[in-house]
Amino acid sequence: TIILFSRGAALNDLRTILVMATQLMSKALHLCVPIRIGVAVGTFFFNLDESMYAGPALIEAYHLGESAQWIGIVTSEAVYRRAIEAELQSGSSDVVIPAEIPVDGGSRSGYVVNWPVILRNSIAAPLPVTGQQVYEGFAQYFGPFESLDQRTRQKYEHTAAFMNTSAA
């Protein structure tokens, strides 16, 4: 688990956290590390000397990231509202957007970082892509796509669907 946090809650702090989360996502994808990220804003306590972290924002971010069944960055509604308030955009697209987020047993409405648009110049394959194409780089570490269990294959298929929809 990697915890990114700011000492403040200003819009510039939010911008910094979203930039860092997106850069982390980009680096992880380039290194073929499938990650899920959750971003929340709110009460958060930390003690750097003891490496202790706690608070509702940490728990919310954890649940947002871990419940998503894809490679992506899920945010809280408060993060979405603040990103809109700050007019955070990549080109003409909002950085945080409403989306259907795949979860166990279906999907739920929520908010996500529009990383396929932000990282559009880093995505090697032309869109649209399939789940198998998203997975290609990971195969060297995790084996052939066909050997993955259904639930794991679906994560890559959900990721491809989001990439195709958001960057269209």
Indicate residue ranges for each PLM-predicted region:
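Catalytic core of nucleotidyl cyclases, primarily class III adenylyl/guanylyl cyclases
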Residues: 1-16, 26-56
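Generic detector of bulky aromatic hydrophobic side chains
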Residues: 2-3, 9, 13, 23, ...
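Alpha-helical structural motif
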Residues: 20, 57-60, 134, 155
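Catalytic/regulatory signature loops of cyclic-dinucleotide turnover enzymes
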Residues: 29-32, 36-37, 58-79
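Amphipathic alpha-helical "stem/stalk" segments
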Residues: 53-55, 60, 83-84
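Intrinsically disordered, glycine/charged-rich C-terminal tails and inter-domain linkers
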Residues: 70-168
